Amino acid sequence: MPPIAFLGLGAIGAPMAKHLKNPDFDLVVWNRTPSKAAAFAAANGARHAKTPAEAARGCQIVITCLPTSREVASLLDGPDGLLAGMANGSILVDCTSGDPATSRATAARLAEKGIGFLDAPVSGGVVGAEAGKLTVMVGGDAATLERAMPALNTFGEKIVHCGPVGAGDAIKAVNQAMLAVHIWSLGEGMLALSKAGVKPEVALDVINASSGRSNVSMNLFPQRVIGRAFPRTFKLALIDKDVRIAAQFLREQNVPSPLTQLTAELFAAAHAELGEEADHVEAVKVIERTGGAEIK
Ligand code: NDP
């Protein structure tokens, strides 16, 4: 069984890593807060490492899933860093929803040591991760992806080679900007309908049989806004980061993007208002506060 390392046992990282605990791999995990790695290892029969270097030693594939590309880059250096543990010929697969420029810089640094890099952000949420049915969007060269496939297949159902390093991050950011637009526009529309006396269940019943429907209207709003549950599965802080990446990417490509830029401003303000622990769908609460009513 070849060893494989997974670093970053957060809301989505932990259920992804669980799929690597299978007969094909000898899983070793590392997490910034060591108690989480120890608990994960004990519950899943994996080993846990004290440092990124220790986790990476002897592994052909090292997977990271951290908040941003910046945290990934910060794990590379020092005596305990990934570069101290990763061998020539090994691969870093970064499942963070990262930014293309930092991923390219990280790939270049790794290439100097003969180490491959793939940006491989995922979509499908915590539910998709638990079910092993994530979509994985990969940037990097095809031969490197081929070698990483056995690992990606454990938690991914649809694995798409998107282009060179940074392409996976770019597609993920554009997808996230669309998710953010859907949340905000449906929140505004539903609040107006609610104020006009239309029941939210009735509004969603119509919208979900019509051309405005989306994952937000079909799943997120019925489960979270109507039920006022707002489970914390994907942080508002992270979608704020994603929309910023999209806004930056569109500016770099010289695409006039007023909608994406405004969405980035709205989510940055919502993040500032609701704090670090709020879930992304809770952005609707800002619309409700400024609109002076609740969607009900
Ligand atoms: P969480 O905030 O739940 O977890 C973040 C993880 O990163 C934790 O393991 C945390 O360690 C670690 N971490 C944070 N800062 C540092 C640091 N400076 N150095 C080392 N480790 C650090 O995030 P998620 O798991 O939700 O998200 C991870 C990535 O996946 C993000 O890029 C996100 O956008 C993306 N994603 C998330 C989805 C979701 O549904 N949650 C869906 C699709 C993509 P510690 O335990 O010590 O805090």
Features from the language model and the residues they span:
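NAD(P)+-binding Rossmann beta1-loop-alpha1 motif at the extreme N-terminus of oxidoreductases
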Residues: 1-64, 90, 95-96, 126
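Rossmann-fold dinucleotide-binding core
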Residues: 4, 66, 97-177
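Interdomain hinge/lid region at the active-site interface
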Residues: 178, 214-280
